[in-house]
């Protein structure tokens, strides 16, 4: 091997290894101190991109979980108010049944009506004041709202909260009354016992309710028979002996058309639209009609509560799934991004030894040109 003065190849090689060991040592110390295997793109460009996408998705999942929890809170608030609405309407129904009893005087019915009116006011107060974060929930202002329960676009669920005001369409229905009064001797005639009720449902389809009454039945028995044949309408008799028919507003897109011999005899005609807000239980007929109206209203409220309960369960399952996805993504990101301390500590010790060895060898290599002096001496 040649002995040179201008170029110390051994020193250059030792210096290169020393620089490499120092760089690797610095990288190990950076990874150990930060806890991350990838601290810049130069460490692992592809891994950095994947890790960033995973972190973005996890962040979105965290927001989605909060959104779903907010949705559950809104539905719990609304459902709690609806529970009280049901309790109040049940009390109003009890009062209506009490008023329909013949043992009550007009004074007593008037007193019962006063409580019904007060309860109606409370129902509307609940509908107007129930809110979440400033948003009214039960007066119709909430309408349909989307809840983003996923980490990507298009993963939203629409929830609709309908009005619980007592003057709403769903809180009542159409009332019909016979123009003719049935006295105590009135009976269904054998050859004039057919009653057909035709109406258009919410789907735009024509429906018919065919009643073939039993001949010999009086007006009260006729009402009972109609109620036993269909759940689409409710029949009752007022204090004047007139047949009353009630159909829920949400079941029809229009009014009922009556036909048949029995319908002609009774002279069925539209009385008007009755809702919870205009109940009048000061008469037997009004009290009977109030029961039908309240049954319709409670059925509507119960259906809304059932829907909210279903959505709450759905959101809970969505949260469970989001948490599971987040857990798996976090594990994947950890494998890509996080430092393996056992491996990196070993690497650091290795580079420290190499650094020390390279430093020693470099010091010795720097003495090699001095051999030329011995040749000159």
Curated annotation (Swiss-Prot):
Disulfide bonds: none
Pfam families cross-referenced by the UniProt entry: Flagellin_C (PF00700), Flagellin_IN (PF07196), Flagellin_N (PF00669)
Main location, first listed in the record: secreted
Keyword Glycosyltransferase appears in the UniProt entry: no
Domain of life, per lineage: Bacteria
Keyword Ligase part of the UniProt annotation: no
Location of this chain's protein in the cell: Secreted; Bacterial flagellum
General remark: V.parahaemolyticus possesses two flagellar systems: a single polar flagellum propels the bacterium in liquid (swimming), while multiple lateral (peritrichous) flagella move the bacterium over surfaces (swarming). The polar flagellum is synthesized constitutively but lateral flagella are produced only under conditions in which the polar flagellum is not functional.
Entry similarity comment: Belongs to the bacterial flagellin family.
Quaternary structure, from the entry: Heteromer of multiple flagellin subunits including FlaA, FlaB/D, FlaC, FlaE and FlaF.
PANTHER family in the record: FLAGELLIN
Protein name: Polar flagellin F
Source organism of the structure: Vibrio parahaemolyticus serotype O3:K6 (strain RIMD 2210633)
């Amino acid at each position: 091997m040649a002995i040179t003065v201008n170029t110390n190849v051994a020193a250059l090689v030792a210096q290169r290894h020393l620089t490499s060991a120092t760089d690797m040592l610095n990288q190990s110390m950076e990874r150990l101190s930060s806890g991350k295997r990838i601290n810049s793109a130069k460490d692992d460009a592809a891994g950095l991109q994947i890790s960033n996408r995973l972190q973005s998705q996890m962040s979105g999942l965290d927001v989605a979980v909060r959104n779903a929890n907010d949705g559950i809170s809104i539905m719990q608030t609304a459902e709690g108010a609806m529970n009280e609405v049901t309790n109040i309407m049940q009390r109003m129904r009890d009062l209506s049944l009490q008023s329909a009893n013949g043992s009550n005087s007009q004074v007593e019915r008037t007193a019962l009506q006063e409580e019904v009116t007060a309860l109606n006011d409370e129902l509307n107060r609940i509908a107007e004041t129930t809110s979440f974060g400033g948003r009214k929930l039960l007066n119709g202002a909430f309408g349909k709202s989307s809840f983003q329960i996923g980490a990507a676009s298009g993963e939203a669920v629409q929830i609709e909260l309908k009005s619980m005001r007592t003057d709403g369409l769903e809180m009542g229905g159409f009332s019909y009354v016979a123009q003719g009064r049935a006295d105590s001797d009135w009976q269904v005639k054998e050859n004039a016992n057919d009653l057909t009720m035709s109406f258009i449902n919410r789907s735009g389809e024509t429906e018919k309710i065919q009643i073939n009454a039993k001949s010999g039945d009086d007006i009260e028995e006729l009402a009972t028979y109609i109620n036993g044949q269909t759940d689409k309408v409710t029949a009752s008799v007022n204090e004047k002996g007139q047949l009353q028919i009630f159909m829920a507003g949400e079941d029809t897109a229009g009014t009922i058309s009556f036909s048949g011999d029995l319908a002609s005899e009774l002279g069925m005609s539209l009385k008007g639209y009755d809702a919870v807000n205009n109940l009048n239980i000061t008469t037997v007929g009004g009290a009977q009609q109030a029961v039908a109206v309240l049954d319709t209203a409670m059925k509507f409220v119960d259906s809304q509560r059932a829907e909210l309960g279903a959505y709450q369960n759905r959101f809970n399952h969505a949260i469970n799934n989001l948490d599971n996805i987040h857990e798996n993504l976090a594990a994947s990101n950890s494998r890509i991004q996080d430092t393996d301390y056992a491996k990196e500590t070993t690497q650091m010790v290795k580079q420290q030894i190499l650094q020390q060895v390279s430093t020693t060898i470099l010091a010795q290599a720097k003495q090699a040109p001095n051999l030329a002096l011995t040749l000159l001496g």
